[in-house]
Amino acid sequence: MKDLGKTIAKHRKDHKLKQSQLAIELEKYDIYVKPNTVSAWESGLSQPNSRQLLAICELLDIHDIYTEFIGKNPDNPFRNLNEEGVRKALDYISLLEKSGDYKIAEVIPLHV
């Protein structure tokens, strides 16, 4: 398992945000914390609750939460692909979606 606080700090710094700025950004999600709370998360003195963590992930563009905070996700179909392989797979998915041939069928409600 990866260090939660270090991971948050890394992504915050990658986004060029100060702890105080992250605290302000969280207000968009009705989450009100002080910069020292962000500091406590990053230093491991405390941890964000699930709602706070999900908002942090959204703000810091963390999309694969499992991989980012725990490690290699056994359910990730891309887990054994390098970056180029992932890119090609995503390109193919995009082509399938654009074709319209593989859309999920809409179920029309039947009123009896």
Regions inferred by a protein language model and the residue ranges of each:
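Positions in alpha-helical segments
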Residues: K6, K10, N36-S39, D75-N76
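Recognition helix of helix-turn-helix/homeodomain-like DNA-binding domains
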Residues: L26-P48, F69-G71
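Interfacial/linker helices and their anchor residues that mediate assembly or domain coupling
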Residues: I70-V112
